[in-house]
Curated annotation (Swiss-Prot):
The gene is ASIP. It comes from Cercopithecus mitis (Blue monkey). Residues 63-79 have a biased composition (Basic and acidic residues). This is Agouti-signaling protein. It is found in: Secreted. GO terms for molecular function: melanocortin receptor binding; neuropeptide hormone activity. Residues 1-22 form the signal peptide. InterPro entries: Agouti, Agouti_dom, Agouti_dom_sf. SUPFAM superfamilies: Agouti-related protein.
């Protein structure tokens, strides 16, 4: 009886190894450098060569001036985009992504609905379908 258990255990171990190794991809053995070069997916000739160019003082100053102009234009653009205060909604409703925990009024957007999480401790108005 011990012999049959030993054979069954050996068979079980063999089957485990066989199933584990059957799912692994076969390894390709490269014999030399030539096969490595031919099998490599990245070819070094595909990349463009890099050229290093020395900058003179005039080009550095021009680039600094251009950078300052860009910075000043960005500052002016940001000053133009002053945040306007939101006007309060006349109807008693909850805006999208705001808290709608009951007994709050309904959501303002007709496509939105109040969704609660964490045992109704965090509720917010969310739009469920974009086709609405």
């Amino acid at each position: 009886m011990d012999v049959t258990r030993l054979l069954l255990a050996t068979l079980l171990v063999f089957l485990c190894f066989f199933t584990a190794y059957s799912h692994l991809p076969p390894e390709e053995k490269l014999r030399d450098d030539r096969s490595l070069r031919s099998n490599s997916s990245v070819n070094l000739l595909d990349f463009p060569s890099v050229s290093i160019v020395a900058l003179n003082k005039k080009s550095k100053q021009m680039s600094r001036k251009e950078a300052e102009k860009k910075r000043s234009s960005k500052k002016e653009a940001s000053m133009k985009k002053v945040a306007r205060p939101r006007t309060p909604l006349s109807a008693p409703c909850v805006a999208t992504r705001d808290s709608c925990k009951p007994p709050a009024p309904a959501c303002c957007d007709p496509c939105a609905s109040c969704q609660c999480r964490f045992f109704r401790s965090a509720c917010s108005c969310r739009v469920l379908s974009l086709n609405c």
